[in-house]
Swiss-Prot record:
Toxic component of a type II toxin-antitoxin (TA) system. Ribosome-independent, sequence-specific endoribonuclease that cleaves mRNA, thus inhibiting protein synthesis and inducing bacterial stasis. It cuts between the first and nucleotides of 5'-UACAU-3' in single-stranded RNA. Neutralized by coexpression with cognate antitoxin MazE. The gene is mazF. InterPro entries: PemK-like, Plasmid_toxin/cell-grow_inhib. Forms a complex with MazE which is no longer active as an endoribonuclease. The keyword Magnesium does not apply. It comes from the Bacteria. One of its GO terms (molecular function) is RNA endonuclease activity. This is Endoribonuclease MazF. GO terms for biological process: mRNA catabolic process; rRNA catabolic process. The keyword Nuclease applies. Keywords: Endonuclease, Hydrolase, Nuclease, RNA-binding, Toxin-antitoxin system. PANTHER family: ENDORIBONUCLEASE MAZF (PTHR33988:SF2), ENDORIBONUCLEASE MAZF-RELATED (PTHR33988).
Length: 120
C-alpha cells in the first residue's frame, strides 16, 4: 500500500514550463485515507540538481540515509496530483522527523498558517 512519506520513482512527463519532469523520485504527501481509496496520489518532486535547500519550501534528504544516488532536495513548491499508474517503484520512506520538515515546508508553500490577509 502507498503511504504518506513513501518515496517512489514516478513518470512526471509530459510537463510544461518550469515543472519538474521525466522519471524521478517523488515523495507521497497525500494522507493515507486518500492513498488507500483514490486512484490518484498527491506528490512533491525530488531533484538531485541541487543538494542544498535554497528556499523555505525545500527539504534536504541525504543519499546515504535514504538510499538515493545523490543528496537531493524535496521541492514542496512543486506538488502535483498523479494517477497511481505513474508510480514505478518504491525506493524508500522518509523518517518521522523528515516528514515534520516536509509538513513545515508545505505550510509555507500553501500558506496554511497565514490567514492575516483574509481579515477585514
Amino acid at each position: 500500500m502507498i503511504r504518506r512519506g513513501d518515496v517512489y520513482l514516478a513518470d512526471l512527463s509530459p510537463v510544461q514550463g518550469s515543472e519538474q519532469g521525466g522519471v524521478r523520485p517523488v515523495v507521497i504527501i497525500q494522507n493515507d485515507t486518500g492513498n488507500k481509496y483514490s486512484p490518484t496520489v498527491i506528490v512533491a518532486a525530488i531533484t538531485d540538481g541541487i543538494n542544498k535547500a535554497k528556499i523555505p519550501t525545500h527539504v534536504e534528504i541525504e543519499k546515504k540515509k535514504y538510499k538515493l544516488d545523490k543528496d537531493s532536495v524535496i521541492l514542496l513548491e512543486q506538488i502535483r496530483t498523479l494517477d497511481k499508474k505513474r508510480l514505478k517503484e518504491k525506493l524508500t520512506f522518509l523518517s518521522e522527523s523528515k516528514m515534520i520538515e516536509v509538513d513545515n515546508a508545505l505550510d509555507i508553500s500553501l500558506g496554511l498558517n497565514n490567514f492575516d490577509h483574509h481579515k477585514s
